[in-house]
């Protein structure tokens, strides 16, 4: 099986040795995104779970678009929250606006102790190539 590695100019610059996405076996595995600004990754992440969730999902959209995909192609999502109890409901409200009600992917959400760049939410996903 061959793999295709995607480094995309419109997505936030990687801060470690990874690809934005790797395509293999008809699936596209998208690296976890934080609420960083793709135009200037030196800027701090926005305050609050709503703003961070929007920015993370917008960054994921950039990666998907760069791979010729959209949220309708997503089949699995993993979400990491630094304060699960405080942020879960608000994150869900924003998250739900990015996926059609009849095309919501499988999902796992977990609480973690810390994320890079003092982020409070990180999301990665798997999409399928139609």
Model-derived regions: residue spans:
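N-terminal presequence-like segments and the immediate start of the first folded domain
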Residues: 1-58, 62-75, 81-130
């Amino acid at each position: 099986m061959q793999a295709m590695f995607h480094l995309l100019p419109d997505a936030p610059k990687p801060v470690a040795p990874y690809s934005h996405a790797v395509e293999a076996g008809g699936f596209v595995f998208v690296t976890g995104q934080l609420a960083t600004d793709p135009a200037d990754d030196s800027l701090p992440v926005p305050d609050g779970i709503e703003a961070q969730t929007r920015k993370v999902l917008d960054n994921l959209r950039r990666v998907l678009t760069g791979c010729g995909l959209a949220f309708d192609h997503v089949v699995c999502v993993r979400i990491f929250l630094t304060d699960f109890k405080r942020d879960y409901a608000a994150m869900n409200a924003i998250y739900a606006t990015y996926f059609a009600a009849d095309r919501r992917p499988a999902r796992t959400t977990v609480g973690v102790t810390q994320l890079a760049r003092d982020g409070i939410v990180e999301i990665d996903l798997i999409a399928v190539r139609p």
